[in-house]
Amino acid sequence: MSVKLRLRRIGRKKIPVYSIVAADQRNARDGRYIEDIGRYFPLREPAEVRLEEDRALYWLENGAQPSDTVRSILRRRGLLLHHHLKKKGESPGEIESAVEEFRERMAEQGEEVKIAVGTRGQDPLERERERAEEIDEEAQLRAQATPLSAVQEETEAEEAEDVETADAEDADAASETDEPEAAADEADETDASADADDNEEPEDE
């Protein structure tokens, strides 16, 4: 049986918490496992890891292969270095001294690791968390933009209706103005014709 050290999700929706487990690599990610050896809290600042180091070393010595994220956790805690030195035959004292020195170096570089967010060395879970936050922000922006678009469309429709109403009123007013002017012109023509008839002289018989 091929054993893998990997993460198994146990957290609530949008609040992920992971068990660090030894499991048959043929099983589903969140399925059956052989042993639970720790917890990983990626959303805490900084991310928190609780790990039974002796059990992690036991599984490494028995050929278990860590996933990328678990490998990163083990490396930062000096367990991969411990396993490597033990395979080389170093004494327990030398191993402990080397691991302690490595952990001090990692602690000094802690701020540099935080600043390097977004680089190739970023943990897969960190990338997943940032991607989830980006999706949530995009959804919120879309939700805010939709009502504004609806209001804008309604306003434009009302403005178009007002323009049509104003044009119709102008047309009616122009029509009413033309009718009195036409009647006045007709009356003027009638008066002029009557004056012309009065001014005609009678013909001699």
Curated annotation (Swiss-Prot):
One Gene Ontology molecular-function label: structural constituent of ribosome
SUPFAM superfamilies with a match to the protein in the record: Ribosomal protein S16
Pfam families: Ribosomal_S16
Gene Ontology biological-process entries: translation
Gene3D superfamilies: 3.30.1320.10
Keywords, sorted A to Z: Ribonucleoprotein, Ribosomal protein
Region named Disordered: 110-205
Record field: compositional bias (Basic and acidic residues): 123-132
Domain of life of the source: Bacteria
Recorded GO CC terms: cytoplasm; small ribosomal subunit
Acidic residues: bias regions: 153-205
InterPro entries noted in UniProt: Ribosomal_bS16, Ribosomal_bS16_dom_sf
Family label: Belongs to the bacterial ribosomal protein bS16 family.
This protein's name: Small ribosomal subunit protein bS16
Gene transcribed to yield this protein: rpsP
